[in-house]
Structure formats: structure tokens, C-alpha cells
Amino acid sequence: GAKEFTEDYLEFMRDQQKPLLDMGIATMYLDNFSARGVKHTYRDQSKASIWSTYVDAFMALEYLSKDSKFNKKKIGISGFSRGGNISMMVGEKRIRDALVSKDLYFAAAQPRSPECGMTGMFRNPQPIKETKMWLVHGMADDLTLNGPCVEQAKKMNANGGNVKIDLREGWHHMFTGNFDAEFVKNFQTFYKCPPWYTEDDGSANKEWLDMLLKHSVFKSEKEFDKISKENPKAAFKKIFKGLKREKCIGKGAHVGGDNGKIFMPEYLSFWKKSLID
């Protein structure tokens, strides 16, 4: 959430600013939370729906594209965890086409540790071919597993995308945090739950819907669609109730790992090659 911009344990986010600026790359931080009255989401993900944050990213792109100080063909995006989801989904053509001009795109995206199995990503992605993507995920990440993201990236590449898959042995979630990895018992995990994908027609996948209907949190697919459109927060709470009844929610995961200084040179090199060279 927004608090992370200033937290001591996330110096990586601030350490990137000066070297990027020295290259001629300005840094803009996109706060998806404060305007929605939220500081963080780890207690209640319904406070800021993940799809609304995809909208935010494209609104930011459109805003920057209208400013003559910036080269609109050389804008990149990066983030970890939910920010990783945003950085991955900005490569989806159908979202872009629904929100902004079809000639706008992020030149490069660098997602870290996104959640790809339980966030409604398209089962059949239609990537924006101009977006060069470098997906980095820790092989020791037990909060958001790398497997679903690897499969998603492979599908993106098969459909004309440009995604480099980079898995790091021993790295956990928040691997650029400047503290040793630690186990947090209160974190919830969802990788044992049925996967949630968005089909080509915009509907949720059958396996996901069947689980929700089985536990009577929605009466029908029609009701699921109606509540999701009219009251996303209420829909999220109903979905969470269904997952609890499915008994697939796990507890506890590792976070951290002082790998920011190791990762930073590669990170800066990616932006130089993608936006400057």
C-alpha cells in the first residue's frame, strides 16, 4: 500500500530514483490506495480491487503521454506483488483497448512476484507486442507461487508477447526488502484454491464459478456477474466466504530477503536498454 513508499524495509523503491534520473529516466510513483481511503490491503483486499489498479496504470500512461516533457513511446512500469500484477497486466491488449487509445503502450514492464493463479488473469492472454517484459519471481516464494506466472508468461509468448521469465533460486516474496527473510504466520495463501481466470468473453472460468455456486455464496452466474459489476467490494467478500467454505486458504508465508543490492544493477540495466538505448 501507500505506506510502503516511505517504509525503512523498502529502501529499494527509493534507491532506484537517483541512478534512473542520472540516465535521464524520471520516476513516478502510482498510489492506488490513498484516494480510496486505504493504507494497505493485507487485512482486506476488497478495499482496493486489483482490476481497478489496472485502470489506474493506463490512466497514468495516458496522463504522461499528453505531457511534452516525456517520450510517450518510452514509458516503463514496475512493481512487486500486487504491483507485479499491474506490471504484468499492462501488457494485455484488451484492457488497453477498452481504456485508452490503441496507439498507447508501455515500452517495458518489470513485474516482480505477482499472483497469477487467483487474480482473474485472462486464460488466453492477448499481449501488446510492443511491451517488453521481464518477469522476476523467487523460486522460494511461498506466498505467490511462481508456477502460475511462468505458465501465464509462456502463453503470452505463444500469442506474440515478449516476456523474459527469470526465476531466482532461494528468493522469497519481497526479495528486495532490506531485511532477512522471515516467516509471517498471519499471511494468507490461496494456491490450494481453484484457479480463477477470465475467459475470452469476459466471464469467470467454470471451475471457479462451480466452487462459488457449490458453497451457495452466489445463486447463479448471473448473480455473480451482477454483484461483481455493481458492488465489487460485496462480491469480493462473498468470494472470500466461498474460499473459506472450500477450506483452501493457507496460513503463513516467508517474506523478505536482502537481495536489493544484488538485483539493482540488473534492474537499472534493463531500463537503460529498454528506454534509452
Give residue ranges: language-model regions.
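Active-site glycine-rich loops that stabilize anionic/oxyanionic intermediates
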Residues: 1-7, 139
